[in-house]
UniProtKB/Swiss-Prot annotation:
Keyword line: ATP-binding, Ligase, Luminescence, Nucleotide-binding
Keyword Nucleotide-binding: yes
Source organism of this protein record: Aliivibrio fischeri (Vibrio fischeri)
Known EC number: 6.2.1.19
Gene that encodes it: luxE
The protein's name in its UniProt record: Long-chain-fatty-acid--luciferin-component ligase
UniProt entry tagged with the keyword Ribosomal protein: no
Length: 378
């Protein structure tokens, strides 16, 4: 399908090579090796940017015996996301911070992340970039129904904000207020858009989509989506883990409820507040890491990269963030895979398997966090 997606380009300031990459290109434009070369260059540039402008991060690097004379980007010091729970770390000046965003806080203390205008614009660009894995429509060809609040009512909770950004790409109806779904309104818009002959994109947390399916089943609502409905989830099940379905069962529930033609009409996304990029799935439901982000799986105890395709502690270096150094080790255990030609979607994929759960693994992460706390002073 030809690329037709239009976003508010007059709101975007394309200031560099990375902005051209994020805002003006498609995911399938480069080979695996070309993506690798692009990633190396952009991550290096991001490291130099933060190293030279952020004294706290530079001191941390020096403590790790790392200067700005890198041999490989694997040498770039990363830190656990828990640092952002206790330290407001930012590279840009306080005057340039557009907003502070928080995690959902389902696991206790919230992370606080500063973002300037350019970082926010690049996040929007990553959503537009990722949507091209799903399909490409003129603005008048599709409408979205968001099982969440609009971006003015997210209370700075990061994932809600990320999901609300689609409003800037396509006409969008929001059907959740104060974390309560208006089921009647949602169903009304489903049928309205269907009758308008436009395609429909339903987005929201998997638990909310699950609740909508239950409502439609209980009320005997039959909806024949065919090939015109696309469902995009994100954010995980969080505090609703007891109600969670495995991916195969969840796929089947959506296929049955919305009478979809193909399973590839269902996509999941990944983002976290400490990461400035949203990862989208391709038609095979594999989450792709864009070429401006370097993803690795690390040994939880040594923090050394494991072999391609092996399970480890997920770490990201995101070159799109100017507000803060987005060089992080997460609490997620997962798998990073290199996808090469002749696959139609060459690049790097990530699969999140589970959270850290052993005392040894958490101890390693906490030990690393303590080291950083001593070297990044308030």
């Amino acid at each position: 399908m030809t690329v037709h997606t239009e976003y508010k380009r007059n709101q975007i300031i394309a200031s560099s090579e990375i902005d051209d990459l994020i805002f003006m290109t498609k995911p399938q434009e480069w080979s695996f090796e070309e993506q690798k070369e692009i990633r190396d260059k952009l991550v290096r540039e991001a490291f130099y940017f933060h190293y030279n402008r952020n004294e706290e991060y530079r001191n941390y690097c020096i403590n790790q015996h790392v200067s700005d004379n890198l041999h490989t980007i694997d040498e770039i010091p990363v830190f656990p996301t828990s640092v952002f729970k206790y330290k407001k770390l930012h590279t840009v000046t306080a005057e340039d911070i557009e907003n502070w965003y928080t995690s959902s806080g389902t696991r206790g203390v919230k992370s606080h992340i500063a973002r300037d205008r350019l970082s926010i614009e690049r996040l929007l660009g990553s959503v537009n970039f990722g949507m091209k894995y799903v399909g490409d429509w003129f603005e008048h060809q599709m409408e979205l129904i968001n099982l969440g609040p609009d971006r003015f009512n997210t209370n700075n909770i990061w994932f809600k904000y990320v999901m609300s950004l689609v409003e800037l790409l396509y006409p969008t109806e929001f059907t959740v207020d104060n974390d309560k779904i208006d089921f009647e309104k949602t169903v009304k818009h489903l049928f309205r858009i269907k009758n308008s002959k436009k395609d429909i994109c339903l987005i929201g947390p998997p638990f909310f989509v699950y609740l909508l399916c239950q409502y439609m089943k209980e009320n005997n609502i039959e909806f024949k989506g065919g090939d015109r409905v696309h469902i995009i989830t994100g954010g995980g099940w969080k505090s609703n883990q007891n109600d969670s379905l495995d991916r195969a069962d969840f796929n089947q529930l959506l296929m049955d409820t919305f009478q979809l033609d193909k399973i590839n009409q269902i996509r999941d996304t990944f983002n976290q507040v400490e990461l400035n990029t949203c990862f989208f799935e391709d038609e095979f439901q594999r989450k792709h890491v864009p070429p401006w982000v370097y993803a690795r799986a690390l040994d939880p105890e040594t923090l050394k990269p494991v072999a391609d395709g092996e399970i480890g502690l997920l770490s990201y270096m995101d070159a799109s963030s100017t507000a803060y150094p987005a060089f992080i080790v997460t609490d997620d255990i997962g798998i990073v895979k290199e996808i090469r030609e002749p696959d139609p979607y060459p690049g790097v994929t990530v699969e999140i398997v589970r959270r850290l759960n052993t005392r040894a693994q958490k101890g390693c992460a906490l030990s690393m966090a303590n080291v950083i706390q001593k070297n990044i002073k308030d």
